[in-house]
Design a protein with these regions (language model features):
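Generic hydrophobic/packing signal
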Residues: 15, 33, 43, 91, ...
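C-terminal cap of thioredoxin/glutaredoxin-like
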Residues: 21-28, 119-238
Length: 238
């Protein structure tokens, strides 16, 4: 069996990444597959956005399409609550720091970063919670069994370490020629191949089977290449 790494470029506020959440969960179940998360910082700095009518009218059609294509749930508290809360701000930096902190706070637990990302996405898209706020993120970490060490790790991952992480992710995107989020890429023997996930949205079992097959192969796959899957651009969903 070959050593294989699956790189996942994501953003916590990318709706299509939420649509691909079952694919990430399935990948984490594949024995022998090393899954690495790379937050891209889609809505950070000048791209942070306060919630308002413009943002709501922009994201809702995309969210409804995501729900239709992937089966992922969107809650009333998100559509009628968070998206109408003009005091809320969409900022990718804090939730990405929380994903990094989940890994840092419990290095021995494989998949904890992915679990944190999934919990953050559910909190946002189903429960309508403010995932850019530190107390909310610490509460989500506590739900996953992370204690005081998570708060310390969260603070340690913020600021310059987080900016460095975003820069590393952007360099990887450039290397892959990735147009946006989500992007999955397999690495074997230093060679990177972007996977076309479009046919697998809403089909996590088929995706898991593909990855298991890749672990047994010495070469590529007919799933490699072709960016057919819908994406969020680096600075927002399209």
């Amino acid at each position: 069996m070959n050593d294989l790494t699956l790189h996942y470029l994501y953003d916590p506020l990318c709706g299509w990444c939420y649509g691909a959440s079952p694919l990430l969960a399935a990948a984490c179940e594949v024995t022998g597959l090393d899954v690495r998360l790379h937050g891209g910082g889609m809505m950070t700095d000048a791209n942070r956005q306060p919630v308002g009518a413009g943002l709501r009218h922009y994201v809702m059609p995309h969210d409804l399409r995501i729900a239709q294509l992937t089966g992922q749930p969107f809650g009333k508290d998100y559509f009628d609550g968070l998206l109408r809360d003009t005091s809320a701000v969409f900022d990718s930096a804090p939730p990405t720091a929380a994903v990094l902190a989940a890994v840092l706070a419990a290095e021995a637990l494989d998949g904890l970063g992915a679990a944190m990302l999934a919990r953050i996405q559910r909190a946002h898209y189903v429960e309508g919670r403010r995932i850019a706020e530190r107390p909310v993120l610490l509460e989500l970490g506590a739900e996953l069994g992370l204690g005081e060490g998570f708060a310390e790790a969260f603070d340690a991952c913020s600021g310059e370490p987080l900016r460095a992480h975003f820069a590393d992710s952007r360099r990887l995107m450039n290397r892959l020629g990735a147009a946006g989020f989500p992007t999955f890429a397999l690495e074997r023997d230093g060679r990177l191949q972007v996977l076309d996930t479009g046919r697998y949205l809403g089909q996590p079992d088929d995706w898991r089977a593909l990855l298991e097959t890749q672990l047994r192969l010495a070469g590529g796959s007919d799933a490699v290449g072709g960016a057919a899957a819908p994406l969020c651009r680096i600075d927002g969903c399209a």
